[in-house]
């Protein structure tokens, strides 16, 4: 079979204005970036405000494995399949970060015959939104350090005279705003800035990957430009010497940050291999951020489509949980159905059983042990009151006997439906059965419910997610986290949602605990204030907000060939 990039390159994309027209978007509501992609102006929402909204379907998965479960393939394939059976459908997915593209995971455009094209344009830069987030974020870091520098060299009266504003008395030991870059760079996790006689007070800092920036979360959770401006103003950048918050508004940088991101608030329209519309917007990771595409993209798509297919990153304990407890809490739009993606390989890998046998070969013992992980994720999704359709993403090595066994077990375990998906190899034709079942699921009465109330304390929210969301028997806060919790309460921010940052490789905090871990306590290392985004991030265990490159990174395969074409993107 051809590689993803070869399949993408063989296709001839339709003019993006034609894709928009079929979907109901007018030409003057687009800002085109060449023939294959365009920004959709947010003002379009005024024109379609009275349109009836379509159905929202969220795609999630079992605990991820190195083999890939095919969540984005399934999201794009389902979009193709729904359109093929006459249901007007749009996909809404995140913009890929270049960190994973050049690292180990690769791109995020789908794959095979269910992908967004041109895939190299999607995976590299797109329309520049991530760069805008990086620039706005780093402007705030520069503004804080500039303020600190000038306040440290001038008396309070002289500073007020020269600047026209009173000193903020920033505590250099309490600068909370780090820097970001859209690459995996472990050496920048912890740095010291201000070295040298004329470069300002020395203090600790560091870099996170741009996908972990609070600005990325703000981009994904804002309703419009005015809302984004308010949220950016609420960013807590540092504390003063009395432990009071210093915001982007107080520094005076919020307006400029918003201007840098003013075009980024518009989602980018692209297409699948079969000409189906796809809105790509925002790119927060699901392990270290909230892991979902934007509310704005969903709002636009829902006003034009019968069905909107979106996805949450990693397993249902990660992106799906945050979709429900963070994104839905902000948007007010609950999902009508959930699709849970699984593969035979994933079940065997999640079995927790040691085996020297090739994972592609039949192995009933590992399959049965790994099924417990799938059952856990089914129950996890069901507790939110959403009908669950399991999608068995078929690999060429899968046996019909194992697939049929798994279908039977899934239905006995209480799923609304279970269908084999051949979207990767067949595109729309391989996802029509799944599409029909999803339509049936959305016709059921939905009883969506959040996991916790906004009025609950931070401790109660953490405990609820740990126990109900991960199966833990409790939480343990480090001394640092306890002190930060008191700070959060003193600032009156304990009404915010909670975003857990943890490993995606286990339902627990320990990536080595496979299957369905039990009896563990969730260790909370730090609590970070994200007042602009509207949540508190709890860093669990040894999770890192800046990834590192592995011994065999993806960039080794990427180059330009003799025809000046990009090769090696996965």
Swiss-Prot record:
BP terms from Gene Ontology: tetrahydrofolate interconversion
Keywords: ATP-binding, Ligase, Nucleotide-binding, One-carbon metabolism
Database matches in Pfam families: FTHFS (PF01268)
Associated pathway: One-carbon metabolism; tetrahydrofolate interconversion
Family, as annotated: Belongs to the formate--tetrahydrofolate ligase family.
List of residues binding ATP: 65-72
Protein name, entry field: Formate--tetrahydrofolate ligase
EC number: 6.3.4.3
Enzyme class: ligase
UniProt xrefs under NCBIfam families: PRK13505.1, PRK13506.1
Annotated GO MF terms: ATP binding; formate-tetrahydrofolate ligase activity
Catalyzed reactions per annotation: (6S)-5,6,7,8-tetrahydrofolate + formate + ATP = (6R)-10-formyltetrahydrofolate + ADP + phosphate
Protein biosynthesis found in the keyword field: no
InterPro entries, A to Z: Formate_THF_ligase (IPR000559), Formate_THF_ligase_CS (IPR020628), P-loop_NTPase (IPR027417)
């Amino acid at each position: 079979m051809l590689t993803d990039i070869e399949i993408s390159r063989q296709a001839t994309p339709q003019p993006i204005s034609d894709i928009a027209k079929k979907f109901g978007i007018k030409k003057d509501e687009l800002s085109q970036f060449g023939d294959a992609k365009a920004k959709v102006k947010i003002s379009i929402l005024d024109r379609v405000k009275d349109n009836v909204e379509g159905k929202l379907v969220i795609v999630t998965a079992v605990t991820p494995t190195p083999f890939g479960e095919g969540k984005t393939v399934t999201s794009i394939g389902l979009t193709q399949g729904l359109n093929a059976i006459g249901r007007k459908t749009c996909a809404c997915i995140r913009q890929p970060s270049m960190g994973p593209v050049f690292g180990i995971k690769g791109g995020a455009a789908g794959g095979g015959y269910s992908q967004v094209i041109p895939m190299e344009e999607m995976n590299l830069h797109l329309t520049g939104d991530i760069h805008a987030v990086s620039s706005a974020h780093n402007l705030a870091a520069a503004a804080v350090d500039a303020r600190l520098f000038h306040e440290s060299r001038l008396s309070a009266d002289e500073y007020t005279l020269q600047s026209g504003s009173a000193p903020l008395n920033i505590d250099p030991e309490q600068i909370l705003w780090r820097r970001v870059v859209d690459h995996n760079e472990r050496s920048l996790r912890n740095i010291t800035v201000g070295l040298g006689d004329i470069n300002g007070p020395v203090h600790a800092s560091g870099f996170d990957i741009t996908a972990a920036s609070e600005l990325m979360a703000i981009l994904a959770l804002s309703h419009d430009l005015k809302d984004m401006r308010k949220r950016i103003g609420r960013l807590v950048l540092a504390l003063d010497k009395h432990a009071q918050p210093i915001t982007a508004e107080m520094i005076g940088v919020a307006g400029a940050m918003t201007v840098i991101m003013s075009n980024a608030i518009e989602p980018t329209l692209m297409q699948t291999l079969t000409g189906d519309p796809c809105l790509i917007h925002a790119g927060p990771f699901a392990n270290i951020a909230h892991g979902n595409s934007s509310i704005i993209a969903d709002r636009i798509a829902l006003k034009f489509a019968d069905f909107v297919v979106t996805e949450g990153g990693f397993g249902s304990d990660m992106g799906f949980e945050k979709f429900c407890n963070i994104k839905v809490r902000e948007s007010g739009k609950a999902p009508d159905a959930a699709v849970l993606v699984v593969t035979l390989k994933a079940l065997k890998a999640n079995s927790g059983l040691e085996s020297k046998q090739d994972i592609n070969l039949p192995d009933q013992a590992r399959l049965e042990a790994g099924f417990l992980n799938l059952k856990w994720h089914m129950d996890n999704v069901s507790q939110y009151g959403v009908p669950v359709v399991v999608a068995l993403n078929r690999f060429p090595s899968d046996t019909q006997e194992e697939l049929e066994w798994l279908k039977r077990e899934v239905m006995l375990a209480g799923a609304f439906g279970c269908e084999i998906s051949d979207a990767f190899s067949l595109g729309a034709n391989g996802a029509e059965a799944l599409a029909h079942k999803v339509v049936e699921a959305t016709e059921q009465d939905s009883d969506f419910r959040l996991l916790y109330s906004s009025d609950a304390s931070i401790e109660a929210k953490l405990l609820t997610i740990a126990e109900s969301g991960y199966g833990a028997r409790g939480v343990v806060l480090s001394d640092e986290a306890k002190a930060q919790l008191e700070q959060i309460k003193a600032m009156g921010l304990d009404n915010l949602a909670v975003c857990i940052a943890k490993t995606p490789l286990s339902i627990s905090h320990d990536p080595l605990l496979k299957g369905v871990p039990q009896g563990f306590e969730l260790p909370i290392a730090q609590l970070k204030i994200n007042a602009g985004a509207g949540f508190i991030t709890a860093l669990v265990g040894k999770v890192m907000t800046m990834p590192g490159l592995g011994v065999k990174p993806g960039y080794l395969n990427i180059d330009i060939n003799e025809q000046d074409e990009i090769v090696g993107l996965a």
